[in-house]
Structure formats: C-alpha cells, structure tokens
Amino acid sequence: MNLKSKKTTAGAFHGVFAALVTPMKVGGDIDCDKLGRFAERLIGQGVHGLVPLGSTGEYYALNAGERERVLRVTLEAAAGRAPVVAGTNAGSTRDVIAFSRQAEQLGCAGVMLAPPYYSLPRLDELFAHFKAVNNAIGIPIMLYNYPGRTGVDMAPDFIERLAGLKQVRYVKESTGEMPRITELLRRCGDRLGVFCGCDTISLESFVVGAVGWVGGVVNVLPASHVKLYQLAVEKKDYVAARKLFFEMLPTLELMEDGGKYTQFVKAACKLMGHDVGAPRRPLAAATTGECSQLREALKQCAEGRRA
C-alpha cells in the first residue's frame, strides 16, 4: 500500500444518501416548489445526504438551466443540514468540468461522476478524464460505477488507481455484485469511502464495511433506510437489521429487477402520498398493474403499509 496516497477521512460522507427524484409538473416542467419540499422531507426523516441529478433524478433529460435550478433548490432546502453531492455527468470532459465547477461554486459538498455515456472511452482516456476533473475542482469526487447505463465498467483495480487522485474520495458501486464491494474495501477502503449503489445488497455491504448507501428507493422509504443503517452500522444489531431488510426486500427487488427503476420510484412515491409526477419522456409513468405490484411489495414493511 502506498502510504503517501492515504487521505484524511475527517468529516467524511457516510450513511444513507437519497438519489433524489426530480419532481415534474403535468406538462413536463420541473416542479421546483415540490422539489424543495420533498428534499426537506427527506432530511426530516433522517437521511444523511442528498444526491440530485443522478440517474434517478433524470439528469440526462434536463438542460443546463434546469440542472442549475435543481441544484439551487436542493441546496436551499438542505440549508447546510445535510451534504448535497451533485451529479455532474455529461458527454464530454469539458461539460463535466463546467458542471462540476458550477456545483462547487453553488455550495455543493461534492460531485458524483460516472464515465461519460455513449462514447465508451478506453481506460487510459477515462483516467485522463477523471484527472482533468480532479484538477479543476476542490471538492470531493464520488466515482459512480454503473456499467449497465454507461457501457464502461470501472473494475476495482482501475478504481484503486483513481484513488490516487486528490479529490477522489468515494465510490458508489452499482453493479450489484457483492464481490466488487469487498474487493474495493480490500484494495482501497482506507482511502475511499465505499457506498453501496445496489439496493438489494445494502445489508451485506454494511456488514463488510461500506460507509453508506446511495439509493433511489430512499425517496420512497426514507425512514426504513435510515433505520437499517442505524441497526447494521451504528448498533451492529444484525438480527434486527436482517428482519427489517427482509421486510424491505420485496420493494427493493421489484425496483432493481423490474427494468423501470425511475418509473417505479416515482410511482411508489405517489403511492406513499408524495406525488412527484411522471418521468420525463421518453420514459412513461408506471401502469396500473405495475402500481398494484408496487403497493403489494410496499405493504411488506411497516413504513410502506400506508400505501
């Protein structure tokens, strides 16, 4: 291990971070008032951090002006009570740097970055991309490995290499492969805070040492997510944590395996009494039958029985 590359973990991000939905009006415009109220509600439920403009937040469907408004509204709602980590993904290094600098200037605590979509950069190109962003900002970077969406897989050895960059402090691992979490912790857990990015392996991830969980279903069941973290990480009451996790699992599995993650998250929010609108087209709202499935899954845990 290269001791020179070790980084301080003082004030580190940890806990449950909501991959924040972007509420939409009937016509497809962003509902900023609802976004602010929804973010405040999540913080009130004990969520430790907010991640606007991620996959669940439909960043790919928003223009630059809308992205800025989402950040401003989220930061105002958070009011320093919870860190805001902005998704700043884009198709080019130039745009990622611009979005990341904007996030820093607005007051975000960090940025979350996946590989640029569609262009399929090779690993040497990807390293140069992250290095350029690293050199352009002074806030932490959370790497985001989600090859199912980006087409580029960042294996643990490559992430270990990226950990040598000053601002690279965290990684959200979203392949759903538990060995990835353990290998990241083994290779660079002393330098990177590892976050689970796949809902169905959250409990196992906590048990082996993940510092947190970035999830979209946090929008739906925030109190349950926070309680699971408290039981598994803070209290180490694994019996109670397992019981709660098994109650949440039908919902988590339906979301992860249904092929309509964003659509289902938004539909489930409505079932829970918080109408955040439909996804922006080309995605469509969940069907009546799908909503019935979601309702039955939600009822398996105490928080979801109000659906």
Please annotate each region the language model reported.
Residues 62-65, 98, 123-126, 154-156, ...:
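Short secondary-structure transition/capping segments
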Residues 81-82, 140, 169, 191, ...:
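Secondary-structure boundary/capping positions in well-ordered alpha/beta enzyme cores
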